[in-house]
Amino acid sequence: MVRWLTAGESHGPALVATVEGLPAGIRVTSDDIAAELARRRLGHGRGARMSFERDVVELLGGLRHGVSLGGPISVVVRNSEWPKWERVMSPDPVDPAALAGLGRNAPLTRPRPGHADLAGMQKYGFDDARPVLERASARETAARVALGTAAKALLRQAYGIELLSHVVAIGAAEVPPGLPAPTSLAAIDANPVRCADQATSERMVAEIDAAQADSDTLGGIVEVLAYGCPPGLGSYVHGDRRLDARLAGELMGIQAIKGVEFGDGFTTARRRGSVAHDEIEPVGGVGRRVRRATDRAGGVEGGMTTGEPLRVRVAMKPISSLTRPLSTVDVTTGEAAVAINQRSDVCAVPAAGVVTEAMVALVLADAALEKFGGDSVEETRRNCEGYLKSLVIH
């Protein structure tokens, strides 16, 4: 079983992440993690924080000379801005005199609509939103991306599974139908909004610029693709073992994600059955080989991978920190007020794709190891190859 946890606050000294259950023999380095974290910072519409903050990666355990050992892998992502926040966010008590007059320490008493602020204050009994927003912040996703790097490496090295994400909608701009190839990732990352279609990309940039001019924010839709999944990952036996249920749960756990769909998703609900499902057809050659004529299901049927590309989309809401804040209530007075204005992005949809890749990778790694077992990359690869050779229908 692959398990993972993160710890740390947005303006704390560091984020800490641990993943347990990955086999020995995965080739992954701190440079690989740093490269993935750099991808997370991509995208037109990111805020000023992306220009001066740096993710400093340190591997604490689970690897030796760039190869996993089979034990828990632990990563620290240090916050380069920590010296500015050392007193305000100190884990240990601080003399009140040292905090006096610090603007960063001013209580945040006007919760933002759409954010965790108010519900978090109510739940944990805080009279200040700072403790809530520090942990609820999407900064935490840097730790998930770090762990997802190891999971991606396993999927690629053991099973030949390749992941990529691309932005399919921002505001009213949406790409035409079509899937990018696994080799398109570099070109997608080079695009200012991580969109595979240049014409749509230009409209997305214009949407972001218009929102910024209006002191507003934008959400959008990201699609994640996994190529090379063998059939049979997941199970139909119980709901919590269905792969799509497991993926949906983790993807909905990403900050600001409000919806998940597989394949054609909600569009399928408006179709007749005769044009909603993927017909199965024979493939020429040796053995009883089959394929789906289409991939409307998104590579998952009955909670299991079909062997077709896994295709899942996530909907990200507009960021709730606005430079022209919405109406709220000041919790200290109970009077109407405008919400606090925290430094933020106009649009973080391109970055959301990198985060969703990481979470899909962790879930697929768990499902693959559940299916094939193995304490090393070589063993689980051998088990997968044996399974594929043994399939009566494949």
Curated annotation (Swiss-Prot):
Binding residues for FMN: 135-137, 255-256, 302, 317-321, 343
GO molecular function, one term: FMN binding
SUPFAM superfamilies: Chorismate synthase, AroC
Keyword entries, A-Z: Amino-acid biosynthesis, Aromatic amino acid biosynthesis, FAD, Flavoprotein, FMN, Lyase, NADP
Membrane-crossing segments per the record: none
Cofactor note (record): Reduced FMN (FMNH(2)).
Pfam family, one: Chorismate_synt
Known pathway: Metabolic intermediate biosynthesis; chorismate biosynthesis; chorismate from D-erythrose 4-phosphate and phosphoenolpyruvate: step 7/7
Primary enzyme class: lyase
Gene3D superfamilies with a match to the protein in the record: Chorismate synthase AroC
Coiled-coil regions listed in the entry: none
KW Transit peptide (keyword) present: no
Family to which the UniProt record says this protein belongs: Belongs to the chorismate synthase family.
HAMAP family, sorted: Chorismate_synth (MF_00300)
Subunit structure: Homotetramer.
Protein name as catalogued: Chorismate synthase
Origin species: Frankia alni (strain DSM 45986 / CECT 9034 / ACN14a)
Gene of this entry: aroC
